[in-house]
Regions:
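Extreme N-terminal leader/anchor segments
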Residues: 1-26
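Divalent metal-coordination and catalytic microenvironments
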Residues: 112
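Divalent metal-dependent catalytic cores for phosphoryl transfer on phosphate-bearing substrates
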Residues: 93, 103, 107, 121-197
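Low-complexity, serine/threonine/proline-enriched polar segments
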Residues: 19, 23-27, 31-35, 39-43
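Short acidic/histidine-centered micro-motifs embedded in hydrophobic/aromatic stretches
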Residues: 40-43, 59, 63, 139, ...
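Active-site flanking loop/helix segments enriched in acidic
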Residues: 48-108, 156-161
Length: 197
């Protein structure tokens, strides 16, 4: 039996999508933002989990953003400095959703990045609209940055079940919170949030 990592490594589609994403990140003009995005893609570690989880959980429960019976606010992780799995091995979502296979996150994200690049170009060509291309690229590249944490592969071949947080899937909130924690711009974080419902 192959591990999820071995499956992703052997998939020409996953590896092509992973290279496409790295190349897209290299197109970001702002050197600081480019370095931050590439660093996150290399190791999407949950730095935000370094906070006081009990206090965060109490605050979220108090505001009705976390179920009162929730036992934790964060998925488990052996280290806040190292992602539980590489970005390119994570699924795109959980069971009964989309891209639920090793490497699904990168194929899903590659399609979104290609689509946003085309949309950016089309608006510029048709209407002369000049958006911040760096924000467009970075927000799409990072929109699911904590799927490797949330959708960890389990020993039985399934992935961890996503829990609700703030009336949506926890990867949405945790990914945006991570960008804020890492000091990325408010414009980027808003664009990243707009990549979700």
């Amino acid at each position: 039996n192959m591990t999820p990592g071995e499956m992703a490594d052997r998939s020409q589609y996953v590896m092509a999508a992973w290279k496409y994403l790295q190349d897209a990140a290299a197109e970001i003009g702002n050197p600081g933002l480019r370095a931050a995005v590439l660093d996150i893609m290399k190791n999407p570690a949950p730095l935000l989990a370094e906070g006081d989880a009990k206090a965060i959980m109490a605050e979220l429960k108090g505001q009705g953003l976390l179920a009162q019976d929730a036992k934790a606010v964060f998925p488990t992780c052996a280290s806040t400095k190292k992602s539980p799995q590489p970005f390119y091995t994570a699924p795109g979502s959980g069971w009964n959703s989309h891209h639920i296979y090793p490497g699904g996150l990168v194929t899903h994200t590659a399609l979104n990045v290609a689509s946003c690049k085309a949309l950016y170009d089309n608006y510029a060509d048709m209407f002369g609209l000049k958006l911040d291309r760096d924000v467009v690229l970075a927000s799409q590249l990072l929109h699911g940055l904590h799927k490797p944490w949330v959708f960890q592969w389990q020993a039985d071949g399934t992935c961890r079940k996503e829990e609700p947080l703030a009336a949506t899937g926890e990867h949405h909130v945790l990914s945006i919170a991570e960008s804020l924690r890492r000091g990325l711009s408010p414009e980027l974080c808003v664009a990243q949030a707009c990549a979700h419902d």
